[in-house]
Amino acid sequence: MEKLWGGRFQGKSEAWIDDFGASISFDQKMAKEDLTGSLAHVAMLGKCGIISDAEAAEITAGLKIMQEKLALGELEFSTANEDIHLNIETLLYTEIGPIAGKLHTARSRNDQVATDMHLYLKQAVADIIHSLKHLREVLVQKAGFHVETIMPGYTHLQHAQPISFAHHLLAYFGMFTRDLERLEESVKRIDISPLGSAALAGTTFPIDRAYSAELLGFSAIYENSLDGVSDRDFIIEFLSNSSILMMHLSRFCEELILWTSHEFQFVELTDAFSTGSSIMPQKKNPDMAELIRGKTGRVYGNLFGMLTVLKGLPLAYNKDLQEDKEGMFDTVETVQTSLDIFAGMIETMKVNEEIMEESTQKDFSNATELADYLAKKGVPFREAHEIVGKLVLECTQNGIYLQDVPFSRYQEINPLIEKDIYDVLSSKTAVQKRNSYGGTGFDQIKVALANAKKSL
């Protein structure tokens, strides 16, 4: 098959080399965007008198037929035509004849592919934002059910202080809110049209870039044609934002994996989000959580891969940029699916409230309460810290907890300690009293929930 760019060449290409250079196997994901961009481009060519109205109408009709065929899965792409752009142009030629060759007037594949990617990512980010908003709604709803559910709070994966389970959920709500803000803020750098930049220097034809941008729904155009065809910052930013988002999902998944274990038993995932073992009949594995945790690494890899591709590229277009698409496509699919799976896990998981609270009775996470109690009685906090630390050691040696220490022993430690100490040491009291702004106290959780609902 003759190449559309073959005029300068005498020798024929070889199939195995064509296969290496072709991108149609993956960039066909942008067929819809490529047709959309071409429709806007031909409309602009007609408006500006670069082609006749009749020619514009004929090309437009052909492109719309191809849109219908694409929707029906009837377009067949060929590696011989390299990429989605040449495939569509070749198919258009088959549809309407030689006039199809006028479509590429005042356009290069360089600005064409950049336009496709902006269109694709703009819609993909909108879809991800929608799913992220749904996840935030799920978290708020779940937190609303568990304001007074007590669980251990951890540092170093050791029991630290008791907290409300809602407080834990709302911590992730805060993380996902920042993810949402980053994605929404990035849209303005995606929503820019490079169409009309041509190969790198613009074109001699009297085009109207603002018109084609308006037809495509872009809010701005690139001010510099070199920048327009070579910019991939918007993809890097998306990959970076996605990496942070996946990191947040992965952290929560790590906790779910721990919490579903026999050692914790804090939560139970439904069968839909679990799998079994081919040899161990009793197993119920949190595979979906593990997969999200694992897929986080591939999103990181896509980010680093893209940065590495770009780090040594001179302006403007280089074939290296063919490597900018697969990581983007993969990240879009991974993030979108991970968000939907994760929201389903959280929405349907069973919370074992009694086990959560019981676990706070078999630890020393109330030690800070005793230290604070002494400090409020006038004991310098560092001295109180020392006293309680020694008492914890004593308790561990005797196999008891702070709430089991006899009152007589508390009196020996410090006569300022009164019988209300046992109420102070209860997990519920410990949580209730932490009512500083942003704290885990029930009143503060209700404030946080109200604020979260307002932000949905």
Curated annotation (Swiss-Prot):
Principal subcellular localization: cytoplasm
Catalytic activity: 2-(N(omega)-L-arginino)succinate = fumarate + L-arginine
SUPFAM superfamilies: L-aspartase-like
GO cellular component terms attached to this protein's record: cytosol
Enzyme class: lyase
GO molecular function: argininosuccinate lyase activity
Locations listed in the record: Cytoplasm
Keywords: Amino-acid biosynthesis, Arginine biosynthesis, Cytoplasm, Lyase
One GO BP annotation of this record: L-arginine biosynthetic process
Pathway as given in its UniProt record: Amino-acid biosynthesis; L-arginine biosynthesis; L-arginine from L-ornithine and carbamoyl phosphate: step 3/3
Enzyme nomenclature, EC number: 4.3.2.1
Disulfide bonds: none
Family: Belongs to the lyase 1 family. Argininosuccinate lyase subfamily.
Annotated protein name in UniProt: Argininosuccinate lyase
